[in-house]
Regions:
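Active-site beta-strand-loop-beta-strand hairpin of nuclease catalytic cores
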Residues: 75-99
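Generic structural motif recognizing short loop/turn segments at the entrances and edges of beta-strands
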Residues: 53, 91, 96-99, 153-155, ...
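Assembly/interface hotspot detector across virion components, adhesins/toxins, and nucleic-acid enzymes
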Residues: 93, 283-285
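Short Lys/Arg-enriched helix C-cap and helix-to-coil transition segments
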Residues: 286-301
Length: 301
């Protein structure tokens, strides 16, 4: 049973929308890829564990324990807190001196020692808050195409079978009030806003216009002649109202400012009259007539 799930990281949402619209720095391209792959791996674990009602599960917590530390999953069951670190590496790797190196040269450093350090810090958190459950930390490689090709003695590279076995273990026990109380205490100390947010933004006026599909993130052609629904080649469907709202939301994020109906029209081939009608209903209005701009209602202050 999940009592906290993760939203897609704001930095990933931003870079995902920028990708394909303008030239991104090499640093941001790497960051985008790592965030995307990491989120997809965590989502895979969430989708599997979310099938079960036993066990108390938490997805994505940042704690301040002598510095900010991000934990992928906590699973609390039968007097044990499982601390899961999820890796979504793909392809063939060699393991040496604590590091994983891919055939393309990518290096994942201190794979297990970093996890042990995070466990030690969480133990300190538990001691401070009088939590006496056993702590078990595991690094789990969830991509079925991940493989360590050299011989490594004494180290276990857990895969999705470890998650399946954990689910079976969860199903053997009922949730207790203490399980829930500990989970709620952990969530209470969650840092909502990370220090690792996007700091450098790209100029909107240099970006390619156009709506992207919320599912596959490819550019989506929205034609005025469409009757009721816009259908992406991936199968995702949107109403015209949803397309207008999606375009507005993403433009506002990319501009980091208020939005005009004309700017939305640059993304979706729908009449400005229809766009204004939708924005008037769902957004906060600034100004009148042709100079009118719009903001999300939760950002009007």
């Amino acid at each position: 049973m999940f009592i906290k799930i993760a939203a897609k990281p704001p930095q990933l949402v931003y870079l995902e929308e920028v990708h394909g619209r303008t030239h991104m720095t090499e640093t941001d391209r790497r960051k985008y890829y790592n965030l995307k792959i990491g989120y997809e791996g965590e989502k895979k674990v969430y989708d599997y564990l979310n099938q079960f009602k036993q066990g108390v599960c938490i997805w994505d917590v940042r704690l301040d324990i002598s510095g900010e530390i991000q934990y992928d999953f906590f699973v609390i069951v039968n007097g044990i807190i499982f601390v899961l670190e999820i890796k979504n590496h793909y392809g063939n790797y060699t393991y040496k001196d604590g590091n994983l190196k891919s055939e393309s040269g990518f290096v994942s450093r201190d794979v297990f020692s970093q996890s042990s350090n995070e466990r030690d810090k969480f133990e300190a958190f538990c001691f401070e808050h009088n939590i006496h459950f056993k702590i078990v930390n595991e690094v789990v490689f969830v991509n079925e195409n991940f493989k360590v090709i050299n011989n490594v003695e004494g180290i276990k590279f857990h895969n999705m079978i470890a998650i399946e076995n954990l689910a079976k273990y969860m199903c053997s026990f009922e949730i207790t009030d203490e399980d829930i109380a500990i989970a709620e205490l952990i969530i209470k100390h969650h840092i909502e806003k990370s220090k690792n947010e996007q700091k450098d933004y790209y100029p909107y006026d240099k970006m390619t216009r156009g709506l992207k599909c919320p599912e596959c993130h490819r550019f989506l052609k929205v034609e005025r002649s469409a009757k009721r629904q816009i259908v992406c080649s991936c199968g995702h469907k949107m109403s015209k109202t949803e397309a207008i709202c999606e375009a507005f939301e993403k433009i506002e994020m990319l501009k980091r400012d208020s939005v005009t109906a004309t700017e939305v029209c640059e993304w979706v081939d729908i009449s400005t009259t229809r766009i204004r009608k939708v924005l008037n209903e769902y957004c906060y209005k600034i100004g009148e007539n042709k100079g009118r701009k719009y903001k999300s209602k939760d950002k009007r202050l």
